[in-house]
Amino acid sequence: MFGLQHIWDCILQYEAQLRSPFFPVLFSITVYLSFCLPFVLLDALSPKVELIRRYKIQQKASVSWTMMWSCLALSLYNHVVYIFPLSVLHWYWRPVSYLAEAPGVLRVVWDLAACLLLFDFQYFVWHLLHHKVPWLYRTFHKVHHKYTSTFALATEYSGAWETLSLGFFAAVNPMLLGVHPMTEMLFHMLNMWLSVEDHCGYDLPWATHRLMPFGLYGGAPHHDVHHQKFKSNYAPYFTHWDKLFGTLHFE
């Protein structure tokens, strides 16, 4: 409790900046690119370094700078054209309020798990529908499947509808569950990290799916199969929904 309170007190020193309508967009872009950067370096080095290349899921696939810039440009475009205006509307309609007291550690862990599990379910339903209904796939989701070999900067390579609808789930869940603002920030960071890791294209020894037991979590190999085959592994993170609906495949 003391540690979290100290961190939260430090964050609240910048409360004026946190209340700015620019903050959500800058926070999202900064965190996202920070998480992508290590994998961009791996992509740049893997053709020359066998030690890195051995962890690449699709050994023969390569990532060009043109592909990276294309993905980065679309991500920045979506943030500026769509996310920022919505951030301004949210700032006007529902001003952010910050509690002085930090949450307890156990409460943070519980709320993070709840937000993540709820998002995982919402994403699964959304994703399944956008693959099973041809019009939805062609109109909205096909752009995300331009690349059949995943890489980190392809995480946010998507059209306006996909960006906004999945962003809506991520934004509304902390409000629905009534979590602390600190937990909400942590959830957005965790959600972005897991999404980038899903698309990174590497099966690293310390990856989340290797740390979580009993095959509960799919990770990068799980999502890479989805980008190759299109008709399986619809849940973004956990495997229980795909197991239940018979859509879980390992290769």
From Swiss-Prot:
A motif (Histidine box-1) lies at residues 126-130. GO terms for cellular component: endoplasmic reticulum membrane. Its EC number is 1.14.99.38. Its cofactor is Fe cation. The keyword Lipid metabolism applies. It is an enzyme of class 1 (oxidoreductase). Residues 113-247 form the Fatty acid hydroxylase domain. It is found in: Endoplasmic reticulum membrane. A motif (Histidine box-3) lies at residues 222-228. Its main location: endoplasmic reticulum. GO terms for biological process: B cell chemotaxis; cholesterol metabolic process; defense response to virus; sterol biosynthetic process. A motif (Histidine box-2) lies at residues 141-145. The chain crosses the membrane at residues 22-42, 69-89, 108-128. Catalyzes the formation of 25-hydroxycholesterol from cholesterol, leading to repress cholesterol biosynthetic enzymes. Plays a key role in cell positioning and movement in lymphoid tissues: 25-hydroxycholesterol is an intermediate in biosynthesis of 7-alpha,25-dihydroxycholesterol (7-alpha,25-OHC), an oxysterol that acts as a ligand for the G protein-coupled receptor GPR183/EBI2, a chemotactic receptor for a number of lymphoid cells. Belongs to the sterol desaturase family. This is Cholesterol 25-hydroxylase-like protein. It comes from Danio rerio (Zebrafish). The gene is ch25h.
